Design a protein with these regions (language model features):
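Extracytoplasmic/periplasmic terminal helices and flexible tails
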Residues: 83-174, 180, 187-190, 365-366
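Phosphate-proximal small/polar/acidic motifs at interfaces that engage nucleotide phosphates
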Residues: 2-13, 18-82, 89-92, 96, ...
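Internal, well-ordered alpha-helical scaffold/interface segments
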Residues: 180-183, 346
Length: 370
């Protein structure tokens, strides 16, 4: 049986351990609204037993506090980052799809349907009285209005494509900054933990940055214990290592040359992305996720095809839609709507011109002008 003072020491160890647990609980409650904070827990184990050369061999010395560790699930980290990438993807697709919808404005009195209906109303009115200068003027006025509508719509589409292009550049800059921060935190965490300290707060910061990084693309993390409190922390971004221990890779935006446009209606200077080490970056992967993929889908997506301008022997130009699932993503982005718009306008203009060249003049003679 332990003596009085030894018993008090055992009791005191329990009080100290309980006090540490209470303080840690208070710390957890205080940080309940802290973004990125991970709940902490006091790890305890039985104190080192003392041999007393008795039949029972040894006596316990109370409880010892081993560590204050984070209570975090790797499985839920992976699921969160997977879903965060999907969230980033669909948020961007929704934002820009709704913007295109406002341009088309089909349910407004001044949208496409209204312009189309007004044009053919004036055509029907002119059919009943072809010689009327007033009705001719009204039809020409509505034709001009339709042309202005399509020109404005095309300009809005091009401006949106350019805005998406700039957002891609901004996203790449943010991704590079986060990669640099993670590499720096890896070094700080290893420095502290190699000397026996606890780097829970720095680990929280690192996990928060990785969570934010997962918004842009698929992210996976692998932490491998090396020994003596040092670990090798690797982050992959869209299938390629972006952080390996204390080093990191970056993405670069490279403007396309004019003769390398994906679509005839694309604005100048659209960016492609590559890794700084020279490896290609593919934002069009079918099973990819993330806000960065959504931006490329919306900027370049043309329903597995692309728009090509053909010129015949007489110098006349026409549009051709070429099916090529390897060139552009399947999503119906800005180029798709531009392509449909161009086809509609080209067809409408051709039909009008054909009718005019086959029509009669005011004096009843056939039109001979081409």
């Amino acid at each position: 049986m332990p003596n009085t003072f030894f018993g008090m020491t055992i009791g005191a160890s329990g009080l100290f351990a309980s006090n540490a647990a209470i303080n840690t609980t208070a710390h957890n409650i205080s940080n309940i609204n802290t973004k990125g904070y991970t709940r902490q827990s006091v790890s305890q184990e039985a104190g080192f037993a003392i041999r007393v050369y008795k039949p029972y061999g040894a006596v316990g010395t109370g409880v010892a506090m081993v560590d204050i560790s984070q209570v975090r699930s790797q499985y839920y980290d992976e699921r969160y980052r997977h879903n965060n990438a999907q969230c980033g993807q669909y948020e961007n697709l929704q934002t820009y799809s709704e913007l295109v919808q406002t341009y088309l404005d089909e349910f407004n009195t001044e949208g496409f349907i209204a312009e189309y209906n007004n044009l053919f109303k004036t055509i029907d009115a002119l059919k009943s009285d072809p010689s009327s200068e007033v009705k001719r003027g009204q039809m020409l006025s509505h034709l001009s209005s339709v042309c202005n509508y399509f020109n404005t719509l095309s300009t809005n589409m091009q401006n949106t494509q350019n805005d998406i292009n700039e957002e891609i550049k901004s996203s790449v800059s943010s991704i590079n900054t986060m990669a640099e921060q993670i590499a720096s935190l890896n070094k700080q965490i290893n420095t502290i933990e190699a000397s026996g300290g606890s780097a829970n707060d720095l680990r929280d910061t690192r996990n928060l940055i990785v969570d934010q990084l997962s918004y842009y693309a698929d992210v996976t993390v692998n932490e491998r214990e090396i020994g003596n409190g040092v670990s090798d922390y690797t982050v992959t971004f869209n299938g390629q290592n972006i952080v390996t221990g204390y080093t990191y890779d970056t993405l670069q935006c490279v403007a396309r040359e004019t003769d390398k446009k994906r679509n005839a209606s694309d604005v100048e200077g659209l960016y492609d992305i590559k890794w700084s080490n020279g490896n290609p970056y593919n934002p069009y992967e079918e099973n990819g996720r993330g806000s960065l993929k959504a931006l490329f889908d919306m900027r370049d997506g043309c329903n597995d095809s692309y728009e090509k301008v053909k010129t015949d022997a007489n110098g006349n130009q026409s549009l051709e839609i070429v099916v090529d699932s390897y060139r552009n993503p399947s999503y119906k982005g800005i180029p798709y709507y531009q392509s449909q718009l161009n086809r509609f306008v080209t067809t409408l203009a051709k039909e009008f011109n054909d009718i005019i060249t086959k029509g009669q003049l005011a004096d009843g003679t056939m039109n001979t002008e081409k």
